[in-house]
């Protein structure tokens, strides 16, 4: 997962 807004479309928590 990627809990950072910088991840763009990959954002997930």
From Swiss-Prot:
Coiled coil: none annotated. It comes from the Eukaryota. The modification Cysteine amide is found at residue 13. Keywords: Acetylcholine receptor inhibiting toxin, Amidation, Disulfide bond, Neurotoxin, Postsynaptic neurotoxin, Secreted, Toxin. InterPro entries: Conotoxin_a-typ_CS. GO terms for cellular component: extracellular region; host cell postsynaptic membrane. Its main location: secreted. The cysteine framework is I (CC-C-C). Alpha3/5 pattern. This is Alpha-conotoxin OIB. It comes from Conus obscurus.
């Amino acid at each position: 997962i990627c809990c950072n807004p910088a991840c763009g479309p990959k954002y997930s928590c």
